[in-house]
């Protein structure tokens, strides 16, 4: 029987995001983000929920870090709220906001946990939306780089591992739309698909300028990465033909050819640009050089995948619909395709052509229909099933020599799930939002045992 063992230096961690857990939305100089404003619009989030209080992590971080110690992780991925650091998006730095992250990081380090800081996880300052329309304007890339310089120069003596931006597609192509009101903040309708693609191009520019800013501002050695939620094409059989079809489909699946390809290769995928036609963004001279910064690692957020097979007509592949009754977790898009972790990693090395680039799974997990039983426990065996099968796929990638170096479960605790409010629970710790009590679920103990044994149990 396979042991599903990981290398001794494999990094086990957990991940969160600022707006989803911190709360304290108007404390210590923080000003509104686009998510504060979006959540205040009737009907935009389920039950009118917002992140104003969330998990109150801002006040409870010390006890949350103790949970991490109990779990056994040595790596924690969190995000820094731009509106806490530069409340107006540009200009003066709010040192009280910086001090919170200093306290958090110091607490992590005292407990032997390495901090991994994401500099942007969707909560851009509302002031920049009011001033020039956020990601519709190239100026945001420069303002983001200034904010990055400010926080890295202040935290770089404590934090070595920096992630620039989390999931560009979600706050651009799910936040802007030409023909409908988009589901994500700031929920902006624009005039054309080209304008939507311009927002993601500006986000790529922000990533590139942030890479430069991190390396210029860091007082010591640092590691720089991007976090992308690639769409993963999975061959329905591992025949030579179906593998080739999945690789052929990968640049054309969702936004891959226009996000991960320019970031990692310095060019939008040629076939993808042709597919976009007049919707392709305007690319100014020098943009691609800025976007294509050297990375020390790549973070992949992977939850599901799309099955693909070879066909005998153009384009040579077919993306397959899933049948009615196919297993799914507690989100409409969260189909159970555990091979996605293996193929996502393999596609970066082979399909994108970056076998040199170390990879971390920076998010993987699932929403489940968690309830407290009569004993006050959450026995989330569905989540354990999901995580076990995905981690087996990750271990396969390691065993075959692909450069997977670490894994961060999403998420440490139940939290504000964006437009779904508090209805969907992704945590391995149950959050009672009324009392702010934290209750480790069965999956918490299971994951702790994986970490303890350094293998999939």
Placement of each model-derived feature along the sequence:
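Active-site region of glycoside hydrolase catalytic domains
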Residues: 1-45, 69, 88-90, 98-457
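Glycine-rich, proline-tolerant flexible connector loops at the mouths of alpha/beta enzymes
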Residues: 80-93
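Catalytic domains of carbohydrate-active enzymes, especially glycoside hydrolases
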Residues: 60-81, 293, 297, 351
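Internal amphipathic alpha-helical repeat/solenoid segments
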Residues: 57-66, 87, 97
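Active-site mouth loops of central-metabolism enzymes
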Residues: 46-60, 136-138
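A common structural microfeature
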Residues: 9-11, 58, 75
């Amino acid at each position: 029987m396979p042991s599903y063992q990981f290398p001794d230096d494999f990094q086990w961690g957990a991940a969160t995001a600022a707006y989803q857990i911190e709360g304290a939305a108007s404390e210590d100089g923080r000003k509104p983000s686009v998510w504060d404003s979006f959540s205040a619009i009737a009907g935009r989030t389920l039950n009118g929920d917002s992140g104003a209080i969330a998990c109150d992590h801002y006040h409870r971080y010390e006890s949350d870090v103790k949970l991490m110690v109990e779990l056994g992780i040595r790596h924690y991925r969190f995000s820094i709220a731009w509106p806490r650091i530069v409340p107006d998006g540009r200009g003066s730095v709010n040192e009280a906001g910086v001090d919170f992250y200093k306290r958090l990081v110091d607490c992590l380090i005292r407990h032997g946990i390495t901090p991994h800081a994401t500099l942007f996880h969707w909560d851009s300052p509302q002031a920049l939306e009011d001033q020039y329309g956020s990601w519709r304007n190239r100026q945001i890339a420069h303002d983001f780089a200034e904010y990055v310089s400010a926080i890295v120069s202040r935290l770089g003596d404590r934090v070595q591992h920096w992630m620039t931006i989390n999931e560009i597609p979600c706050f651009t192509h799910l936040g802007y739309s030409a023909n409908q009101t988009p589901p994500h903040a700031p929920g902006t309708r624009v005039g054309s698909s080209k304008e939507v693609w311009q927002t993601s191009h500006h986000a790529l520019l922000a990533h590139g300028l942030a890479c430069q800013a991190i390396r210029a501002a860091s007082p010591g050695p640092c590691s720089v990465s991007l976090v992308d939620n690639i769409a993963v094409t999975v061959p329905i059989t591992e025949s030579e033909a179906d593998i080739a079809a999945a690789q052929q489909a990968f640049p054309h699946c969702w936004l891959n050819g226009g996000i991960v390809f320019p970031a990692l290769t310095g060019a939008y995928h040629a076939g993808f640009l042709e597919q976009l036609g007049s919707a392709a963004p305007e690319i100014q001279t020098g943009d691609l050089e800025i976007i294509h910064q050297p990375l020390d690692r790549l973070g992949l957020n992977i939850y599901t995948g799309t099955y693909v097979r070879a066909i005998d007509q153009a384009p040579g592949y077919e993306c397959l619909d899933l049948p009615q009754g196919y297993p799914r977790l507690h989100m409409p898009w969260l189909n159970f395709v555990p091979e996605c972790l293996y193929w996502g990693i393999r596609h970066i090395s082979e399909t994108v052509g970056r076998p040199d680039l170390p990879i971390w799974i920076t998010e993987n997990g699932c929403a489940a229909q968690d309830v407290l039983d009569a004993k006050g426990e959450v026995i989330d065996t569905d989540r354990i099933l999901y995580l076990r099968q995905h981690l087996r796929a990750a271990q396969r990638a390691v065993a075959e020599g692909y450069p997977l170096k670490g894994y961060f479960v999403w998420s440490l605790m139940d939290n504000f799930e964006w437009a779904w409010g508090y209805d969907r629970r992704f945590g391995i710790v149950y959050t009672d939002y009324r009392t702010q009590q934290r209750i480790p679920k069965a999956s918490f103990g299971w994951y702790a045992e994986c970490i303890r044994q350094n293998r999939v149990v």
